[in-house]
Amino acid sequence: DMAVNIAAGDIGLFNDNAKYHIDRIASLRTVLARINTKGVLGDPKVRAAFISMTDRKAYNEVILKGTFIPGKAPVPPSLDYGFDQLTDPNAYNVDRAKQLLDEAGWKDTDGDGIRDKDGKPLSVDFVIYNSRAELPIYAEAVQADGKKVGIDVKIKPVDYNLIDKMGIN
């Protein structure tokens, strides 16, 4: 018998069990979030802050059970193009994220914990599909990290087939 593509959250069921032999190989598969470059995320400082506020290392360790390598370039670590020598300008750094948002003019003027500018709250939709069990959990982690810097992250589950259409529009 054989199983492939075991969900990250389920791999622990098979570890340390003499009944199972697990072979792991590096994959070209990625877990990514596409960032809209319109609206509030049209500002490069807000985009950089959004990326800097996300603790991708913790997401991998806790949600994905250490089965992925956090990205820092559009090149997967399984390709030998010097991935280990690359730097990550948007590594997890809450203070940097807050500073970038300050520089972009987003402040919490009403004390509700969410930054605002010109009377509008800093709110971002995080669109996910539910066919992969880890995505809602991942989105909730991003939402919690958003609160740390004053971004209201709204989770919007949609059918998988709508994701690409949303990117086109």
Task: Please describe what each predicted stretch is.
Residues 4-10, 56, 75, 160:
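Beta->alpha turn/N-cap motifs
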Residues 70-109, 130-137:
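Structural transition elements
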Residues 1, 50, 101, 126:
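Conserved hydrophobic/aromatic pocket- or pore-lining residues that grip, position, or stack substrates
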Residues 10-11, 46-47, 59, 97, ...:
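Short, hydrophobic alpha-helical packing/hinge segments within bilobed ligand-binding/sensory domains
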Residues 1-38, 61-62:
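Extracellular/periplasmic solute-recognition and catalytic clefts
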Residues 27-49, 53, 62, 74, ...:
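A bilobed periplasmic-binding-protein/Venus flytrap-type ligand-binding module shared by bacterial periplasmic
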Residues 19, 39-40, 46, 51-68, ...:
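Sec-exported extracytoplasmic/periplasmic mature domains
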Residues 107-169:
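Ligand/substrate-recognition segments at binding pockets and active sites
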